[in-house]
Structure formats: structure tokens, C-alpha cells
């Protein structure tokens, strides 16, 4: 009986790993900014003076940022452990990133150039990484651990 050891993370898998690590860093920084803003007494006074819908939107945005950070952290750990579920969850994570980029493009009061650039980077990464994760024999040979 022969057992094959899983391949190491390398080759073209370093690109998706780098994208994941940069996303983890950016979501961590976003959470730090949210926390810094929410820890200020002036923020509570300002939010208290806003409409209830604005307060709810702030809360939903903060909870979404926490959920995305947690999911990105979990996926990064699973990526390094070469778990079998990584390709499926990486694709789900990319689709969530596309949805958030489309939301930012459509609804945020951000300059169009910044929103378009964020949307294009996310769409390009998704268009390149999803077929690679679905069809690559290297991906199938790397992510084999339960």
C-alpha cells in the first residue's frame, strides 16, 4: 500500500495565496479603523444624532466586516493546512468579494475611479482563479487533507 503525500503550496497557487493574505491584511486594517472610530466618544454622539436606519447600516457594515475577516482568516489557515474544502470555499470567498465590490461600486459615495479599479481587480482575479481552482491537477493534488 502506497500513500502519496500532498504537494506543497507552490507554482501558480502562490498567486491566490498572496491575494488571500493581502485581503486578510486589508480586512484587518478595516476592522482596526472601524474599532478606532467606534471607540471615540464623538462617534457615539454623532451616531446617536443620526437616523435609526443610519445606525443600523453602521451596525450591519461592522458585522459584515467582522464576518469577512473571520472567514478570510479561516480560509487562510485552511489554505496552509491544505484542506480538501479550500477550492470550494476560495471560490465562495471570491464571489463574496465580487458582490462587495459591486455593492461598493453601485452604492458607496466613493469616486468612480477607485470603485471601478477595485471592481476590475476583483473581477479579474475571480476570472483567472476560479477556472484554475476548478480544473487544475495541481490544486487537486495539493488540497487533499481532511
Curated annotation (Swiss-Prot):
It comes from the Bacteria. Signal peptide: none annotated. Keywords: Cell inner membrane, Cell membrane, Membrane, Transmembrane, Transmembrane helix. The chain crosses the membrane at residues 13-33, 60-80, 90-110, 113-133. InterPro entries: DUF2569 (IPR019690). It is a multi-pass membrane protein. The keyword Transmembrane applies. Residues 1-12, 81-89, 134-146 are cytoplasmic. Residues 34-59, 111-112 are periplasmic. Pfam families: DUF2569. GO terms for cellular component: plasma membrane. The keyword Ribonucleoprotein does not apply. It is found in: Cell inner membrane. To Synechocystis PCC 6803 sll0481. This is Inner membrane protein YdgK. It comes from Escherichia coli (strain K12). The gene is ydgK.
